[in-house]
Design a protein with these regions (language model features):
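Ferredoxin-reductase
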Residues: 39, 45-119
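Conserved small/polar residues in nucleotide/adenosyl-binding loops
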Residues: 121-123
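An N-terminal, well-structured beta->alpha segment
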Residues: 1-64, 70-71
């Protein structure tokens, strides 16, 4: 993957095709690069990460956390939780930000995404 799939970047999150077999716009490699980029450009030391139950989520969450960790970020793995739980963690736990691996309101099982916040700000 040389370029970011720009059409997946929305106003408040990242969403796109993410099949459980690792194909689509949002691949495990994309998630790893996203973790590395967030660690590099946001300058956070700790991140909370939650996830939903879509087929593609385990690989995306694992690679996102690996990218964050390999860049020096301490990751608090919240497990399978709601998006609200990740936001609550950002407000109440000693973390600099959070990421929820979810396609949010999209009903298609072939899609997934990332909702991110930095402190109390959605990014």
């Amino acid at each position: 993957m040389d370029e970011w799939p720009e059409h997946c970047f929305k106003a408040y999150d990242i969403r796109g095709l993410a099949s459980g077999d690792g194909t689509g716009d949002l691949t495990p490699q994309f998630a790893y690069r996203l973790g590395r980029a967030m660690a590099t450009y946001l300058g956070c030391k700790t991140f909370a990460v939650g996830r939903d139950i879509r087929d593609s989520t385990p690989a995306l969450a694992s690679e996102l956390m690996r990218g964050l960790s390999e860049s020096g970020v301490t990751v608090k793995d919240l497990g399978i939780v709601s998006t609200g739980c990740v936001y609550h963690a950002c407000w109440t736990l000693p973390v600099d930000g959070g990421v929820m691996v979810t396609a949010s309101h999209l009903p298609m099982p072939t899609h997934n995404g990332f909702k991110m916040c930095l402190s109390l700000i959605h990014i």
